[in-house]
Amino acid sequence: MKFIIKLFPEIMIKSDSVRKRFIKILTSNIRNVLLRETEQVAVVRNWDFIEVRAKVAEEIPLILDLLKRTPGIHHILEVQEMPFTSLHDIFEHTFAKYQNQLVDKTFCVRVRRKGKHEFSSLDVEKYVGGGLNQRIESARVKLTKPDVTVRIDINGDKMLLVEARHEGLGGYPIGTQEDVLSLISGGFDSGVSSYMFIRRGSRVHYCFFNLGGASHEIGVKQMAYHIWSRYSTSHKVRFVAINFESVVGEILEKVDNGQMGVVLKRMMVRAASQIAERFAIQAIVTGEALGQVSSQTLTNLRLIDKAADSLVLRPLITHDKEKIIALAKQIGTDDIAKSMPEFCGVISKNPTVKAIESKIVEEEGHFDFDVLEKAVQNATYLDIREIALQTEKDVVAVEATSALTEKDIILDIRSPEEMDEKPLVLAQAQVIELPFYKLSTQFAHLDQSKNYLLYCERGVMSKLQALYLKEKGYQNVKVFNLPK
């Protein structure tokens, strides 16, 4: 099977040199993504499209799923390639493929052609369309809005019959734009804003300000890992965690109640600017939307930006909450966000919506900035690919096993798409399907007299979720490894 990758239209209108660079980067990204999962694939770059050849038929659904989640791809054509010798040969190949699909249907033929031939694209459309109309009695030609569009691509002495068209993610390939640092809290907004910059071609690193202990950090790591694993595995990214509990304590003790929200955000962008400068990252990304909460008025946002040494970007600035939640649902972060508490909103009871700069500066004069510097100096840096290993060191260890007892139930915590693609079937073992993002709300409703062995394909999410449940006080959880 062969896939033809069509590029995001904005790439095609670039100058020749820029377009060539973008296509080269996208080809490299596709290789990186696919080769993490299978070696039975070939990727070939062309002038205005990319070919992907699947060598093993069983891996076609996996390859297609990965391509649909790769930024820079407008759409994917699933095609069958075959040689031809004449115009009639093209018709015969097309008839063999479509004779059953066109019964009692309206259809039209659309042809794209490259190379030197004795016929034009219109000649092929007329010949093949007329032949199909004659051979299939119940079929009828309809040039506008037909039931079936027969698509044929001709290149030299080969023809491609398009079996299916799949929409891609769009956007620019990761690496065509400069890196950004996303301030991720685990809520709806920060996850969506991170995704939007990934789709726009930036490599997104993550900076997390821990206000709620180990369980809060585990939850945010789950979201960051989920976004990375679905949309940006072509690139290595960093996860930076800064313990901000001491900073919050200093603010609570020394800053006027009404100014706390703005001061906290200013401390965050100060710290993030230092991290960004260290790694030559050009901008900070936040999930703020205009007027959504008290600190997100134009006056307050301007004062927050004044504390930053880096450019602050807000892709959601005009988005409604309803639209943000819909996007979170689309990318699979909504259920994680639902279980995440909003710590920033609880430190100020009467927040100002129109902070005065002189007042903010005065309040920050009471703040001991050594506390902030110490928090930044003690930040932890993690390659997101090693997130499970680092978590094991930081939090209570979780037992992993492949042996089962009568009290053991396996919890398949993969996403519904992964479950459908590779169902987990084990002889003499009860398997319950419960996606990882529902564990925080539904685990308590399970029979707690049983032991639950959490399973995911790579073991990353199962370890994180087991650690999260241990933090919540559940001792009847382990990680399940498939027997070899």
UniProtKB/Swiss-Prot annotation:
GO terms for molecular function: ATP binding; CCA tRNA nucleotidyltransferase activity; tRNA binding; tRNA-uracil-4 sulfurtransferase activity. GO terms for biological process: thiamine biosynthetic process; thiamine diphosphate biosynthetic process; thiazole biosynthetic process; tRNA 4-thiouridine biosynthesis. The active site is at residue 456. It is an enzyme of class 2 (transferase). Keywords: ATP-binding, Cytoplasm, Disulfide bond, Nucleotide-binding, Redox-active center, RNA-binding, Thiamine biosynthesis, Transferase, tRNA-binding. One of its GO terms (cellular component) is cytosol. It catalyses: [ThiI sulfur-carrier protein]-S-sulfanyl-L-cysteine + a uridine in tRNA + 2 reduced [2Fe-2S]-[ferredoxin] + ATP + H(+) = [ThiI sulfur-carrier protein]-L-cysteine + a 4-thiouridine in tRNA + 2 oxidized [2Fe-2S]-[ferredoxin] + AMP + diphosphate; [ThiS sulfur-carrier protein]-C-terminal Gly-Gly-AMP + S-sulfanyl-L-cysteinyl-[cysteine desulfurase] + AH2 = [ThiS sulfur-carrier protein]-C-terminal-Gly-aminoethanethioate + L-cysteinyl-[cysteine desulfurase] + A + AMP + 2 H(+). Coiled coil: none annotated. Its main location: cytoplasm. The keyword Cell division does not apply. Pathway: Cofactor biosynthesis; thiamine diphosphate biosynthesis. The keyword Transport does not apply. Its EC number is 2.8.1.4. Disulfide bonds join 344-456. Residues 61-165 form the THUMP domain. ATP binds at residues 183-184, 265, 287, 296. It is found in: Cytoplasm. PROSITE patterns: RHODANESE_3, THUMP. Residues 404-483 form the Rhodanese domain. Catalyzes the ATP-dependent transfer of a sulfur to tRNA to produce 4-thiouridine in position 8 of tRNAs, which functions as a near-UV photosensor. Also catalyzes the transfer of sulfur to the sulfur carrier protein ThiS, forming ThiS-thiocarboxylate. This is a step in the synthesis of thiazole, in the thiamine biosynthesis pathway. The sulfur is donated as persulfide by IscS. Belongs to the ThiI family. This is tRNA sulfurtransferase. It comes from Haemophilus ducreyi (strain 35000HP / ATCC 700724). The gene is thiI.
